[in-house]
Amino acid sequence: MSKQLLLGDEAIAQAALDAGLSGVYAYPGTPSTEITEYIQMAPITTEQNIHNRWCANEKTAMEAALGMSFVGKRALVCMKHVGMNVAADCFVNSAITGVKGGLIVIAADDPSMHSSQNEQDSRFYGDFSLIPMYEPSNQQEAYDMVYNGFEFSEKTGEPILMRMVTRLAHSRSGVERKEQKPQNGISFSEDPRQFILLPGNARKRYKALLARQDEFIKASEESPYNKYTDGPNKKLGIIACGIGYNYLMENYPEGCEYPVLKIGQYPLPKKQLLQLVESCDEILVLEDGQPFVEKHLKGYLGIGIKVKGRLDGTLSQDGELNPDSVARAVGKENKSEFGIPSVVEMRPPALCEGCGHRDMYITLTEVLKEEYPSHKVFSDIGCYTLGANAPFNAINSCVDMGASITMAKGAADGGLHPSVAVIGDSTFTHSGMNGLLDCVNENANVVIVISDNETTAMTGGQDSAGTGRIESICIGLGVDPAHIRVVVPLKKNHEEMRQIIREEIEYNGVSVIIPRRECIQTLARKKRSK
């Protein structure tokens, strides 16, 4: 087959298409977004009617993908690492139900928090869910793992978790494609109770899952993605996970002097681990993220050998790996340091010139500072989070998707007035609606600003689930229509916005203000395409 130059994300997408994908389900989030976008733009997606719409959130995406698997078809679900927290309910239980059609879950982790609130490691989710996991070291492996992973999922009857990291997701390499497979036809499980997790059946299926762990370990021991390479210097043995193997080989282009165990499939392969441990004086673990393998190694085999890595300070406990940090860990002299030259000015992200969020924040901050000095503003995840920076300095919190509304409610419950939430339209339909329902049920004294730019802007302008329907959703959740106020955030409407904000702060109950103006970047793209 042909060879293509692909991002890591694109390699995953192309592999899924080549493997007979029937549907991709996702909520946009860096660094996973490009997977779904690639599938959406691929001609074969239209030709073969492959489902490819964005979902309201990661939980609905995971559930829809499991439904696709239920009818015997192959499904891909994609999210960033924090999205796993949202999808976890269905994800963990899907390990117990198992699958019919192949199901691969992509969790794109973000070590160093380039565009995230934390750098949690998704391997822990796969571990406590007791399912097999993949972690590619390069783009070709990412392709191969997904292409073959659907068959592996169907063979094991389990979803497969694949962990990506930012540097691999957003870098390019040549990828050899394989032959195109047809989509599966509709078929159903021979066990009519497979997906019914009543306690009696759930206990039975959970015991069966536990009994299969040795089978999964054996699959890891026989996997081409786990490779033991001997070396003459036995003072150190190296376990290199995922992209960590790439960084190690960059330091040893002619071959490493130490024995190396490359890890690309989990659970950990016991035989290869024992081989490495028994032949080396010390073990160094290279993993991009939290010390997942390092922690397992200390208790996994009951070994007394010294293990080095993030926990003992050989590698930093936070941030991502790079070739230089790996070089230092193995005692090699650094020829060059990664870093930003001092002559390059920092360019922190900022709200675009002409963005409706700017006019919203200017007006909101003006009213609050002038008339309500005790105010607090609880914000959310999206472009408008940049209101934390100068010149606005407008928000007091940003924790997780949907937290703005519920934190504002909690603060109001504690006596804060005014308590203001700022949330975007896409984040509102992702995880803000439940919080609004809580506010309505208790008639909380909060002002909720749903800043509607009619898209999911922060991740590149994907469709927003609530576009054109925010008012209807709020009415459906029980908000008094008289206190749902829509305004166009422009300078000419500045006084109108001020008056609306004042009126709704003075109202004792739930108020929703919707500043609505199309994202300036979306508007620019439309003009360029004409």
Where is each model-derived feature located?
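Thiamine diphosphate
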Residues: 1-139, 167, 257, 292, 386-512, 520-528, ...
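Flexible, low-complexity linker and terminal segments
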Residues: 1-13, 17-19, 136-351, 356-357, ...
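Short, glycine-/Ser/Thr-/acidic-enriched flexible segments
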Residues: 31, 82-83, 108-111, 138-140, ...
